[in-house]
Regions:
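Short alpha-helical oligomerization interface
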Residues: 1-5
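Solvent-exposed alpha-helix faces
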Residues: 19-20, 102, 106
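Catalytic-core segments of class I nucleotidyltransferases/pyrophosphorylases
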Residues: 80-82, 89, 95-102, 115-117, ...
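A short, conserved acidic/glycine-rich loop-to-beta-strand motif
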Residues: 104-114
Length: 212
């Protein structure tokens, strides 16, 4: 088995496609939080010569999502950080996302997308997130698309290795009015199942929307 971000779509790992999206918007300085089979990711991206500066941070085998983000703090310092998972592809305009984040001036922006169902649900009033639930069986509304922007102060919301990003840290951001949603109505698809992979391969062959 290989880590999910290394599953290939169109002959390239998911993580490569995600980084390529950022690079097209001139974001080429990457910090990859390594966990399960992190050496596979490190080996592949150590050979990439696209002008990307890829830094590998071993965040531990059993560290939770919030803990992994917390461990990146000393490398990111006091800069605004763009953060994403390694299992979703989208045609998000990252310039617009960053502009939106700067305009509202809060600690966290999440990209909200329309489901294919079965994901964490977000309730939004205006642009402000009023509720964030990790999982939902609702078939409408907005879900967490996984493309975040965070300010340095947000790291203080994360207790340690056992923290789930999607629970206390983001729920605290909601309760303090520091969590806003950028609504993305374009293409978004995550890859959780073999069916998702087959679907993404089919989309790729027709002309990958995340590359346009």
């Amino acid at each position: 088995t290989i880590p999910k971000p290394m599953i290939e779509i169109g002959g390239k790992p998911m993580l490569w496609h995600i980084m390529n999206l950022y690079a097209r918007y001139n974001h080429k300085n990457f910090y990859v939080a390594l966990g399960y089979k992190g050496e596979v990711i490190k080996k592949y991206f150590s050979k990439i010569s696209k002008g990307w500066n890829v830094n590998f941070i071993d965040t531990g085998q059993k560290t939770m999502t919030g803990g992994r983000v917390k461990r990146l703090q000393k490398f990111i310092g006091d800069e605004t950080c763009m953060l994403t998972y390694g299992d979703g592809l989208a045609n998000i305009n990252l310039d617009s996302l960053l502009d939106f984040h700067k305009r509202h001036g809060k600690l966290v922006t999440v990209t909200a997308v329309r489901p294919p169902a079965r994901f964490g649900a977000i309730q939004i009033k205006g642009d402000k997130v009023t509720s964030f639930k990790e999982k939902s069986h609702l078939e409408e509304g907005w879900i967490n698309g996984g493309f975040f922007i965070i300010e340095p102060k947000f790291f203080s919301f994360i207790d340690g290795d056992d923290a789930y990003l999607e629970r206390e840290p983001l729920e605290q951001a909601v309760s303090e009015g520091e969590f806003f949603a950028y609504k993305h109505n374009g293409f978004w698809q995550c890859m959780d199942t073999k069916r998702d992979k087959d679907n993404l391969e089919e989309i790729y062959l027709k002309g990958a929307p995340w590359e346009k």
